[in-house]
């Protein structure tokens, strides 16, 4: 049997072991209200009194009208019935959930179901992490490398012991050695297989010591201070008992730790420098009574002083009374008389039973009324913050001894797996900046908590038959709370943010990953959890921007000294007092900041609120909360507004000094790299905006200012002032778009064209019960300088009304008058055009075109004029009056428009032709995409199509050849046909999303499925940090500025190359036929511009713009030329393979080139390996964190 066949059989067997269960619906109309993970199967779906409740083999999901609860089953500690009809769920992370039912029988039925679901597993394979991994294996059967990247931790975790020994600089020649006495866990089942001990301690002595220490947990070194050589060691309590036993080998080992530390300090100190002073010695602080003159400054004197070991600090986490009481159970503490040169300190930390009671009191307090009058006193009575204070003080004592006193420290409690890892892990975090990075923190957790046997299965309650409640205690959660306190005090010292810690708390209990299963490494090895489950570090990886602290500075304090008083500590509200997740993103429809997803390197993760027309608003409001940003897209809402839709809506012009990141809402203009402004209505669907603007022209006024600057006056038609005010309030998104159309173009020509093109237009509209509202908003021409004036011209909508005969209504525009001293007519395009839909089922991949030839507008001197010109900032705008030809434009289609339907089959959009403004300087093109609207408001959508995102297009200018001689001239109008190629960008995004989101299979949208914007890829609720979100917006704005500068440099380079080619052509005397194209290309700054080829008005009508990169294949860098990774500069060797990026061709290591995405430019339409930089530009979606602020930032306090 070949390997492939055997692998496929293994996948089949794995899925047979974890089969999907039959779904039981209490109501046939109910659907699963969430998207299931791989291996997840929903068992029950029913209705509570005011919610929909669903239970799967992984989670409990309760969808209320205005919020939702999404909890993994293993996070629930207990379920009980209260008040007959109410279920009371207590969670292990301090949350309490209440669910009300209509009948007592229904309440009891769900009580029984939940108690069966949360019962500790009979065997470990019953935990969801095994089913999740098995089903993932089937999905990735054809992509083994990608599967490994997704489910495995990094090399820094798998090779942690060797890397840490080298990084901390242990002297393995003279002072220390690595003992393999615990190989295959034959000495101690809860210890790692490799231990660091003094070099002269033999394995036989270690065996003797193990008989004297609790659970055979002998003293082992875990950390070395890289500057002074002081170390931290850990162990279990000595088994002194009432008989006062002692062990000579144990006493020798403890003293040897101090001697080896002194020896290691001497050897490392001699390597550093020859300039020795008292502070260079490990006992420099004790030299104050020595007259340090030249006679003692020689090498022999320094060496003799360094040999003397420092006094070792034995830190016992217990109180003295508790340590003495443990002698009755065979334990005890070190006797100072038996351990010379040692100091014993008792910290008085509470045991797990006291911590559990304190946590239960805290949980009870957090479930009370939101604002109890005695909150602070009640919080103090729980003693939770007091326990955190004692823990921080204990760790700080270790830090002070190692860093300042340069003394070695030995830490233990009773057994050495609860309070001991808390102290040593916290001390290492304070001492070493490496552990404050994401990778270092992962290594810290793996070594101090997992390798040294913290009993996660017993403490978290997900072990096999772990019914003993006395063994449960949130020890690891308490430690994470201390880390959170450090984050608050040192916001710039941690690479990871609070969301990282919140995720770690959730997955400590969720059992989605196998990292925290079992009680020790021996059990995990026997159960093969590493091979059969995914690692939590694959989610909390260093490359995930959602968990990076943007305030982090690697140059921050090397050693942290926090304030440990209770008054300086704060309750961790994100974990203990979380806000309920909104049901849908429409709850937070007012975003106070512009969308940060404007940079390709910063993919968006949230959704914009949607705007729709409803047949029955009452029904719509029953399903979700009302939209705050809803506009009058339904005729039944505002008849007065419908009667005056012809009025021109103008948005306020942004001042030249406006902060690009200070827009108060998405409806306000947002600066983009080219200087253009984009104001996006909060309710426009993503696919609609994308198709509207994807082929939009790269517009800029190409007219240099004449000696006397001309102004543009804009005036709305005669209209009721109250109505005008109302229309401005209801549609503040009205935008500026420069359009050209000859007013003399007859109705006959347009109607003739309409007869041919309108059936195609109407055929693209599918019949739906709810209407669409498509809004093109606020695309303003980027100004050349301060003196430019942006002229808002028109917005247009398409509304599909579900009443009898379907109609699409286009509002009648107001003709604009543009004057250079005298007014020139520049009529704005279409009006109201009713049409019938051809059928309910229209293929979604069809792209419809509506084209027409548009004549240019001639100015007084015979040159072509534009509606958008540069104007003096001191001039007032002139008048833009309605034209008499306005009424003749009724029932005309949008000239030069392109109709698209997205791949989701429900979006109709009207798209401006890329060259609607002829031969104006084409500067920065924009593509916006918002959330694609489907038939159902609450349908599932790809997260990659979720947030407004702008994709800059190649930069350049399109100027007429005559512009060099006549500064104020504009060039000809191109036909819409020249730019009518259909872009399928939204379809490509959807295709990429299907390939990239591997954590969940596809699901059919249903009326009960909410939007997934508040659920992360791990099925948990998304945690949002407003401060980090704002920082990402600032970072995004900075990246945009950098990209703009890069493009300007490229533009100048192209201009220089163009001038060089032109000058060389004249110099060589080549005046062949090509000379006719020189005037058209002299001023052209874009090599790809359509107007470079001819001066004929419509000669490019049959040409299509082709990017130069589209015709070239990426040239790969040869393997033999790449010795280091192009991104991280790490050297390649046997275990670090070389990987080519299929997009840029450079060579990377596996961690820097671990993403897969289609690369259409290289004819690679299946997911192919690319580097992280190319992945960010090719893939508009990424997991996990919402880059757009959904709520205004508000200060909170506990």
From Swiss-Prot:
A Pfam match: Myotub-related
Residues annotated as binding Zn(2+) 1: 1125, 1128, 1149, 1152
Function field: Decreases the levels of phosphatidylinositol 3-phosphate, a phospholipid found in cell membranes where it acts as key regulator of both cell signaling and intracellular membrane traffic. Could also have a molecular sequestering/adapter activity and regulate biological processes independently of its phosphatase activity.
Quaternary structure (record): Forms heterodimers with MTMR4 that recruit both CEP55 and PLK1; occurs during early mitosis, regulates the phosphorylation of CEP55 by PLK1 and its recruitment to the midbody where it mediates cell abscission.
PANTHER family reported for this sequence: MYOTUBULARIN-RELATED, MYOTUBULARIN-RELATED PROTEIN 3
Domain notes from UniProt: The coiled coil domain mediates the interaction between MTMR3 and MTMR4. It is essential to bring together CEP55 and PLK1 during mitotic abscission.
Name of the molecule in the record: Phosphatidylinositol-3,5-bisphosphate 3-phosphatase MTMR3
């Amino acid at each position: 049997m070949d390997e492939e066949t055997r692998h496929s059989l293994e996948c089949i067997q794995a899925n047979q072991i974890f089969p999907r269960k039959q779904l039981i619906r209490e109501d046939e109309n109910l659907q699963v209200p969430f998207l299931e993970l791989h291996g997840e199967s929903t068992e029950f779906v029913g209705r509570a009194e005011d919610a929909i409740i669903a239970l799967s083999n992984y989670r409990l999901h309760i969808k209320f009208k205005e919020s939702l609860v999404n909890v993994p089953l293993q996070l629930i500690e207990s379920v009980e019935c209260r008040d007959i009809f109410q279920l009371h769920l207590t969670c292990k992370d301090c949350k309490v959930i209440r669910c009300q039912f209509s009948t007592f029988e229904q309440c009891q039925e769900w009580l029984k179901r939940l108690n069966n679901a949360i019962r500790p597993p009979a065997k470990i394979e019953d935990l969801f992490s095994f089913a999740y991994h098995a089903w993932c294996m089937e999905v990735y059967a054809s992509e083994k490398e990608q599967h490994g990247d997704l489910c495995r931790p990094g090399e820094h975790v798998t090779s942690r012991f060797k890397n840490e020994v080298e990084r901390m600089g242990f002297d393995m020649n003279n002072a220390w050695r690595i003992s393999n006495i615990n190989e295959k866990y034959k000495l101690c089942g809860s210890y790692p297989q490799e231990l660091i001990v003094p070099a002269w301690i033999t394995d036989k002595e270690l065996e003797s010591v193990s008989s004297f220490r609790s659970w055979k947990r002998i003293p082992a070194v875990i950390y070395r201070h890289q500057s002074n050589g002081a170390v931290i060691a850990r162990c279990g309590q000595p088994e002194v008992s009432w008989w006062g036993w002692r062990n000579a080998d144990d006493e020798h080992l403890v003293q040897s730790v101090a001697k080896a530390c002194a020896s290691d300090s001497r050897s490392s100190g001699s390597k550093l420098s020859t300039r020795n002073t008292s502070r260079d010695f490990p006992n420099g602080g004790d030299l104050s009574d020595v007259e340090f003159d030249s006679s003692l400054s020689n090498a022999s004197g320094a060496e003799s002083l360094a040999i003397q070991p420092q006094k070792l600090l034995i830190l016992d986490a217990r109180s003295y009374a508790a340590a003495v009481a443990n002698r009755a159970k065979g334990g005890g503490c070190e006797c100072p008389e038996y351990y010379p040169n040692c100091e014993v300190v008792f910290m008085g930390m509470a045991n797990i039973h006291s911590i559990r009671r304190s946590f239960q009191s805290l949980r009870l307090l957090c479930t009370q009324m939101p604002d109890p009058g005695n909150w602070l006193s009640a919080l103090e009575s729980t003693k939770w913050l007091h326990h955190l204070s004692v823990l921080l003080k204990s760790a700080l004592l270790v830090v002070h001894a190692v860093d300042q006193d340069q003394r070695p420290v030995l830490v233990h409690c009773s057994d050495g797996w609860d309070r001991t890892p808390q102290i040593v892990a916290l001390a290492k975090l304070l001492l070493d900046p490496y552990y404050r990075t994401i990778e270092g923190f992962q290594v810290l957790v793996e070594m101090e908590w997992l390798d040294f046997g913290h009993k996660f299965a017993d403490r978290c309650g997900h072990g096999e038959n772990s019914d003993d409640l006395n063994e449960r205690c949130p020890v690891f959660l308490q430690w994470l709370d201390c880390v959170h306190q450090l984050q608050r005090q040192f916001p710039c010292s941690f690479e990871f943010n609070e969301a990282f810690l919140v995720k770690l708390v959730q997955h400590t209990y969720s059992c989605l990953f196998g990292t925290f299963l079992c009680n020790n490494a021996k059990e995990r090895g026997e159960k093969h959890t590493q091979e059969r489950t995914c690692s939590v570090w694959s989610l909390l990886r260093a490359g995930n921007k959602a968990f990076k602290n943007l305030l982090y500075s690697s140059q921050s304090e090397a050693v942290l000294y926090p304030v440990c008083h209770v008054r300086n500590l704060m309750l961790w509200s994100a974990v203990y007092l979380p806000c309920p997740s909104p049901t849908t993103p429409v709850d937070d429809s007012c975003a106070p900041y512009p969308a940060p997803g404007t940079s390709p390197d910063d993919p968006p993760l949230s959704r914009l609120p949607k705007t729709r027309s409803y047949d029955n608003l009452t029904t719509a409001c029953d399903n979700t909360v009302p939209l705050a940003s809803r506009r009058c897209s339904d005729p039944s809402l505002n008849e007065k507004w419908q009667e005056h839709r012809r009025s021109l809506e103008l948005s306020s012009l942004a001042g030249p000094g406006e902060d690009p990141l200070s827009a108060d809402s998405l409806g306000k203009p947002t600066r983009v790299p080219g200087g253009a402004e984009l104001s996006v209505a909060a309710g426009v669907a993503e696919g609609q905006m994308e198709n509207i603007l994807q082929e939009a022209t790269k517009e800029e006024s190409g007219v240099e200012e004449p000696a006397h600057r001309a102004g543009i006056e804009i005036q709305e038609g005669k209209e009721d002032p109250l109505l005008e005010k109302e229309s401005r309030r209801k549609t503040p998104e009205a935008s500026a778009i420069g359009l050209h159309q000859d007013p003399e173009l007859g109705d006959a020509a347009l109607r003739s064209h309409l007869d041919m093109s309108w059936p195609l237009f109407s055929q693209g509209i599918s019949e739906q019960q709810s209407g669409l509202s498509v809004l093109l908003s606020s695309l303003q021409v980027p100004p050349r300088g301060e003196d430019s004036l942006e002229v808002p011209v028109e917005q247009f909508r398409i509304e599909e009304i579900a009443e009898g005969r379907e109609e699409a209504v286009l509002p009648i525009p107001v003709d604009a008058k543009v004057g250079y001293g005298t007014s020139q007519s520049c009529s704005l395009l279409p009006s109201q055009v009713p049409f019938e839909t051809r059928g309910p089922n229209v293929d979604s991949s069809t792209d419809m075109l509506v084209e027409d030839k548009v004549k240019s507008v001639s100015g007084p001197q015979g040159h072509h004029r534009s509606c958008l010109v540069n104007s003096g900032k001191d001039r007032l705008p002139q008048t833009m009056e309605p034209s008499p030809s306005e009424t003749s434009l009724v029932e005309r289609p949008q000239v030069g428009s392109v109709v698209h339907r997205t791949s989701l089959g429900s979006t109709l959009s009207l798209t401006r032709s890329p060259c609607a403004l002829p031969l104006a300087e084409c500067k920065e093109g924009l593509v916006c995409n918002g959330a694609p609207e489907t038939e159902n408001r609450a349908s599932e959508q790809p997260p990659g199509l979720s947030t407004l995102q702008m994709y800059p297009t190649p930069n350049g200018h399109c100027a007429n050849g005559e512009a060099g001689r006549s500064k104020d001239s504009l060039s000809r109008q191109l036909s819409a046909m020249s730019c009518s190629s259909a872009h399928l960008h939204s379809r490509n995004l959807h295709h990429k999303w299907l390939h990239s989101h591997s954590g969940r299979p596809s699901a059919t949208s249903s009326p009960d499925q909410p939007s997934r914007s508040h659920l992360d890829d791990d099925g948990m609720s998304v945690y949002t940090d407003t401060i980090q979100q704002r920082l990402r917006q600032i970072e995004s704005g900075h990246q945009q500025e950098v990209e703009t500068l890069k493009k300007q440099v490229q533009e100048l380079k192209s201009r220089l190359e163009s001038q060089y080619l032109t000058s060389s052509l004249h110099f060589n005397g080549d005046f062949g036929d090509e000379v006719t194209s020189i005037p058209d290309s002299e001023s052209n700054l874009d090599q790809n511009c359509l107007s470079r080829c001819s001066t004929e008005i419509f000669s490019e009508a049959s040409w299509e713009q082709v990017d130069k990169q589209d015709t070239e294949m990426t040239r790969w860098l040869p393997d033999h030329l790449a010795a280091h990774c192009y991104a991280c500069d790490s050297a390649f060797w046997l275990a670090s393979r070389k990987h080519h990026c299929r997009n840029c061709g450079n060579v990377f290591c596996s961690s820097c080139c671990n993403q897969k995405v289609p690369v259409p430019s290289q004819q690679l339409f299946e997911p192919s390996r690319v580097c992280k930089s190319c992945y960010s530009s090719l893939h508009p979606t990424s997991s996990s964190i919402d880059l757009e602020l959904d709520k205004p930032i508000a200060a909170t306090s506990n």
